[in-house]
Design a protein with these regions (language model features):
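Catalytic cores and adjacent binding grooves of peptidoglycan-active enzymes
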Residues: 2-26, 42-45, 66, 83, ...
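Residue-level detector of functional hotspots within protein domains
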Residues: 51-53, 78-80, 138-140
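Active-site-adjacent substructure of cysteine-protease-like catalytic cores
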Residues: 58-90
C-alpha cells in the first residue's frame, strides 16, 4: 500500500564551488593551519596526492582547518597492520574545524558538519576512506573507529 500525504519539498543549494583539481594554489591558506613542519613540507614539495589537495581547496573555502597529519608525520602502518594511505600521501587527519576540536562529536559540531559534507561529495572527489568517532553516513564509505574520536581521517586508495 502507498502512503499519501501533503508536504513541501525543500532544497538546499550547494554552498561550495569545486575548484580546479591539481594545484595547492587553490587552497585558501588563510583557512589552513598545518600543525607541523613535516606536513607543511609535504604540501609544498608535492608529496600529497592531488585528491587530498583538492579536498583541502574545497574545504578551506568555507572552513578553517587544523590538519594534524599528512604523509611524513604519520607511521607507515595502521593500528590494524595495513600500510596507511598517509604513507603514500593519500590521506589527511583533520583535528580542528573553525576552532572547535574534533573531540566534539555532537551532531551540530563543525567537525560533524565537515564529515557529513565529505560523504556528500561526488564520486571521484569523495574520499574512499572516511573515519571518525562515529559512522557519518551509514552504508557509505565512512565508518567509526575508537582511535579516531579526536580527528576526521579522509583518504583515498590508489588512483
Amino acid at each position: 500500500d502507498r502512503i499519501a500525504g501533503e508536504g513541501e519539498v525543500a532544497s538546499d543549494g550547494w554552498s561550495i564551488a569545486f575548484p580546479e583539481s591539481g594545484t595547492s594554489n587553490t587552497i585558501n591558506w588563510d583557512n589552513l593551519n598545518v600543525l607541523n613542519a613535516a606536513a607543511q613540507s609535504d604540501i609544498q614539495n608535492g608529496l600529497v596526492d592531488p585528491r587530498i589537495e583538492h579536498l583541502l581547496a574545497i574545504l578551506t573555502q568555507k572552513y578553517t582547518l587544523d590538519i594534524s597529519s599528512l604523509r611524513s608525520d604519520h607511521s607507515m602502518m595502521t593500528a590494524s597492520g595495513n600500510v596507511s594511505n598517509h604513507y603514500y600521501g593519500r590521506a589527511m587527519d583533520i583535528a580542528v574545524v573553525n576552532g572547535v576540536s574534533c573531540t566534539d562529536m555532537s551532531s551540530t559540531s563543525p567537525c560533524s558538519e565537515v564529515g557529513r559534507l565529505l560523504t556528500l561529495l561526488p564520486d571521484g572527489v569523495k574520499p574512499t576512506e572516511l573515519i571518525y568517532g562515529y559512522d557519518l553516513d551509514g552504508s557509505g564509505p565512512a565508518f567509526a573507529l575508537a582511535d579516531h574520536r579526536n580527528h576526521i581521517h579522509a583518504g583515498f586508495g590508489p588512483a
